[in-house]
Swiss-Prot record:
Protein name per Swiss-Prot or TrEMBL: Negative modulator of initiation of replication
NCBIfam families: PRK11187.1 (NF008389)
Alphabetical UniProt keywords: Cytoplasm, DNA replication inhibitor, DNA-binding
Superkingdom of source: Bacteria
GO molecular function, one term: DNA binding
Any Gene Ontology CC annotation: cytoplasm
Main location: cytoplasm
Gene Ontology biological process terms from the UniProt entry: negative regulation of DNA-templated DNA replication initiation; regulation of DNA-templated transcription
Lineage: Bacteria, Pseudomonadati, Pseudomonadota, Gammaproteobacteria, Pasteurellales
Organism: Glaesserella parasuis serovar 5 (strain SH0165) (Haemophilus parasuis)
Record's function text: Negative regulator of replication initiation, which contributes to regulation of DNA replication and ensures that replication initiation occurs exactly once per chromosome per cell cycle. Binds to pairs of hemimethylated GATC sequences in the oriC region, thus preventing assembly of replication proteins and re-initiation at newly replicated origins. Repression is relieved when the region becomes fully methylated.
Keyword match DNA-binding: yes
Length: 186
């Protein structure tokens, strides 16, 4: 029996394929690689099997990303269809409703996206009001509902749309959804 090191993601993938209590990692890998159940003195693994195993290791992460993206899309669709959003006359409130929905649906992706979305001279997102206010004398900020984030709010409607679209693109949301949001802020 030999010992090998595998990264956490691969370890969790192999462990998730356990079919019986006490099944060893060797048994699981033999099943996944379609090798005989009894150990052989030497087994030649073909290149295509190695590539197939690499592809299998990527599947859980891709499925998680797709599931998370679906959750975000549904949350945004819900806001767009809500009477609260459609009856709201103030652009800043519509802006905050959508930002809140994006955060609630995928806080991790939202957080990463805010790090990449900023103006040439202003910070658009921060975890405290003072960080945003420090970027200019006439800057106003509001807290995004149900999130730890603050956002700059004294932009015109079109700029709010640009900020939202940039954030959604950074979150890797579908272009057609981004285009629908952009149309709301023209």
């Amino acid at each position: 029996m030999k010992t090998i090191e595998v990264d956490d993601e691969l370890y969790h993938y192999i462990a998730s394929r356990t079919q019986a209590i006490g099944e060893s990692a060797s048994d699981i890998l033999r099943r996944l690689l379609r090798l005989p159940a009894s150990p052989q003195p030497f087994v030649l693994v073909q290149e295509n099997m190695i590539n197939e195993l690499k592809d299998l290791a990527k599947l859980p992460k891709q499925k998680k990303q797709l599931h998370q993206q679906d959750k975000v899309i549904k949350q945004v669709e819900f806001v767009l269809a809500s009477s609260l959003f459609n009856n709201e006359t103030k652009g800043v409130n519509r802006f905050l409703y959508l930002l809140s929905a994006l955060y609630k649906a995928d806080p991790e992706s939202f957080s990463h996206a805010t790090e990449n979305v900023q103006g040439s001279e202003r910070i658009y997102f921060a975890r405290d009001e003072q960080t945003i206010l420090a970027t200019g004398s006439s800057v106003k900020a509001k807290q995004i509902p149900e999130s730890p984030f603050w956002v700059i709010t004294n932009n015109n409607t079109e700029r709010k749309g640009i900020i939202l679209c940039a954030l959604m693109n950074a979150m890797e949301l579908p272009e057609e959804l981004v285009a629908r949001i952009k149309a709301q802020f023209n």
